[in-house]
Regions:
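Function-critical hydrophobic alpha-helical transmembrane segments in multi-pass membrane proteins
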Residues: 124-143, 156-185, 191-249
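N-terminal, membrane-interfacial amphipathic/helix-forming hydrophobic leader that caps
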Residues: 1-147, 294-369
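Short, hydrophobic secondary-structure boundary micro-motifs
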Residues: 149-152, 188
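Membrane-interface helix-boundary motifs at transmembrane edges
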Residues: 57-63, 152-157, 225-230, 274
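Interfacial helix-capping/hinge residues at the ends of transmembrane alpha-helices
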Residues: 148, 221, 225, 263-267
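Alpha-helical transmembrane segments of integral membrane proteins
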Residues: 25-26, 67-75, 123, 127, ...
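Functionally important transmembrane alpha-helices
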Residues: 237-241, 246-247, 254-337
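Aromatic-anchored segments of alpha-helical transmembrane domains
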Residues: 77-85, 170-179, 241-249, 284-296
């Protein structure tokens, strides 16, 4: 048994203000944030446009045609369509569950009845990962001379740009802490509604969730931008932000609006750093923390390692809630300590990397033309 999320009328302060003016609030917020994104990434956008202009001129001078936009955009359209119709809950329940049920009759260890929702999200995550990664293999078939590392997979210089990860979180986390109190977010997250049942449920779900995010970053910020940058320049970033926003339709309104900024900002970050890894870290940090905060606001963080079949009642339920709260606080203090240590280590690695390159600590890393 868990506590219900607060109704909109019960919210006060900043959270109540956001809920009241939610329909129009994203407009000025998007304008303000996108202006900051423009200030931070305008040089990156200009470099992308200059590179694309030079590459198109070279192709035109040779009398050739760049088939990359055609191949990339058709692949993206096919994959997103297949995922929508065959990677969701409806297809799983109508087609996959009957097959699983027959298999589960012979293999009772599957515990299909107990974990049917988790199996459903396993299908969802699996189809996403497969669809998002598939273009990389196909790309190597169509364009053998292209390096897959140029599709956002380079790790060189990671620590030179790691400070941007902290900068992004400094902007995103305060806003997330506020909107996480919204009823929309409190009832929507986590996707897997049995996450509070046990740590097995919660951690298994988060592992699938994070793996899906890594594949998503490969697809949108790696494959899409790497394939289209030489033809579209910075326009590839803004073109990518459209379908990226659309895959958020059905999620809370503020999140769907925020996906516009996130798509542009994370895409620009990927183009600046030549990798998807900082964007992935931002994405999973926010997503994992959002799940945790939603459970915390409902007083529904997991307590038991494995699911239990007996629900406590009366005083036993109150005692379990006290244990649940105490465990959650202990985990948060431990996580805060680990994060602080990792932050210090990251700062040390950044300073060492910059000194090794003979860069000043307060300037942006030099970027190649």
């Amino acid at each position: 048994m868990i506590a219900p999320a607060k109704a909109a009328t019960e919210l006060s302060g900043l959270a109540g203000f956001i809920e009241t003016y939610k329909p129009i609030l994203p407009v000025p917020a998007l304008v303000a944030i996108l202006f900051l994104v423009w200030l931070f990434f305008r040089d990156t956008w200009r470099e992308l446009d200059e590179d694309a202009l030079r590459m198109r001129a070279e192709i035109h001078a040779e009398g050739r045609m760049d088939h990359r936009p055609f191949v990339a955009l058709v692949l993206v359209a096919i994959i997103l369509t297949m995922q929508e119709y065959y990677g969701g809950r409806i297809y799983f329940e109508t087609t996959i569950v009957p097959a699983l049920s027959k298999f589960a009759e012979r293999h009772v260890a599957m515990k299909l009845t107990k974990y049917e929702e988790l199996y459903g999200f396993g299908w969802w995550a699996g189809t996403r990962v497969f669809g998002y990664v598939l273009p990389f293999a196909l790309w190597k078939i169509f364009f053998r001379k292209d390096s897959l590392l140029d599709l956002g997979l380079r790790t060189k210089g990671f620590f030179d740009h790691a400070w941007i990860y902290g900068l992004f979180l400094a902007f995103v986390l305060p806003a997330m802490l506020v909107v996480s109190r919204s009823p929309d977010f409190g009832t929507y997250y986590p996707f897997y509604k049995q996450s509070s049942r046990s740590w097995f449920d919660f951690l298994t779900w988060e592992a699938m969730y994070f793996l899906q995010f890594f594949a998503l970053e490969m697809f949108f910020r790696g494959f899409w931008l790497g394939a289209l940058r030489r033809s579209f320049g910075s326009g590839a970033i803004f073109a990518m932000a459209v379908p990226y926003c659309m895959i958020h339709f059905g999620k809370p309104y503020l999140e769907a609006c925020g996906a516009i900024v996130a798509g542009i900002a994370l895409g620009s970050l990927s183009m600046k750093t030549k990798s998807i890894y900082q964007g992935f870290l931002v994405h999973v940090t926010v997503a994992g923390l959002m799940d945790w905060l939603a459970l915390r606001h409902r007083k529904a963080t997991p307590l038991h390692l494995w699911p239990t079949d007996v629900a406590p009642i009366g005083n036993a339920w109150l005692l379990e809630q006290e244990k649940r709260e105490a465990l959650a606080r202990t985990i948060e203090r431990t996580a805060a300590g680990i994060f602080a240590v990792l932050f210090v280590l990251m700062v040390v690695m950044i300073v060492r990397s910059r000194l090794h390159r003979h860069d000043r600590l307060w300037t942006l890393p030099r970027t190649k033309a």
